[in-house]
């Protein structure tokens, strides 16, 4: 059963207290918080003051995703703001190993994100030092984009690389995650589903979280359909 991390960037910030309450009371596992600087990605989102406020309201893990240049300069500030896990981008770090050591030394769980064009092999050397890996399944910076199908193969490749380390390293996916593609992602090896638009643009976000949480691998679904069809043939 995957972990579900609602991305608050897609939520209604006018009612952020209600959003936090809903996530707390739902089957969601983490809060996913996207920080954008307008340089590494085109958009600017929110920063440390908003994370501090969310941290006060959140009763679950705060997974902070830094889409910013020179993340090492602000790492201590994000720890102080309340980040439990801190994700930096491979593409922005000049000294990735040092960044990871810094995050861990401050008491946070380190993670690295890779953009759609970045091969998973680029993380081979740093992989044993990570708590999880974030595979971007859209180009970062904007919500509501369409899922990139090739991402499934990247998840499979990352799963194989992790198995070779002998460590328990989680795979997180973010971008265009929906009820339709979640089962295939889980089957490929995804452990954490980040979803924003899919959850917060629905009339019943709690139900969407429930359905994502209960995403079954595609092979399970096909087996169920075969059994169902056989039972119908047998008894009707």
Predicted regions and their residues:
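Conserved N-terminal beta1-alpha1 strand-loop-helix module at the mouth
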Residues: 1-87, 92-95, 102, 110, ...
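Conserved beta-strand segments that form the floor/walls of ligand-binding pockets within enzyme
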Residues: 3, 113, 134-137, 172, ...
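Short helix-capping segments at alpha-helix termini
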Residues: 27, 57-60, 105-107, 162-168, ...
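Short, acidic/turn-prone active-site loops that include or flank metal/cofactor-
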Residues: 91-93, 115-118, 138-141, 197-200
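Targeting/processing segments of secretory and organellar proteins
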Residues: 218, 222-233
